Regions:
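Short glycine- and Lys/Arg-enriched binding-loop motifs that mark or flank ligand-binding interfaces
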Residues: 13, 19, 60
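Short beta-strands and strand-loop turn motifs
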Residues: 13-16, 48-50
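N-terminal active-site wall of soluble small-molecule enzyme domains
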Residues: 49-98
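Short, well-ordered coil/turn segments that N-cap beta-strands
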Residues: 9-13, 41-45, 79-85
Length: 98
């Protein structure tokens, strides 16, 4: 069964990470675990996390570290793991920075 499941996953890229960026230590812990799990299965992986969760439905809910700090946190994950990075943007003006 393990052999069959690895054949089914062949050629897939896993995009994974926390919903929103947390503190640097937790981001790195998640990235390394995702990298390990993907590597064990022969998958490529892209680390994805948001710097701003603008779609929160509860007023005052935590939204993330913001653009500048979030990009720094993502860069730290990339530098430490070598993983490609992905985030989402909510406004056209954020694209140049991201």
């Amino acid at each position: 069964v393990a052999h069959e499941s690895s054949l089914l996953l062949s050629g897939f890229t896993l995009i994974s990470g926390p919903c929103v960026l947390e503190d640097a230590g937790l981001n790195l812990e998640v990235a390394r675990e995702v990298q390990r799990l993907a590597g064990d299965r022969g998958l490529d992986v892209i680390f994805k996390a948001s710097f701003d969760k603008a779609n929160r439905s509860r007023p005052g809910a935590a939204r993330g570290p913001g653009l500048e700090k979030g990009l720094r946190l993502l860069a730290e994950v990339g530098a430490a793991t070598g993983l490609p990075l992905l985030t989402d943007v909510h406004e056209p003006g954020q694209c140049a920075r991201a």
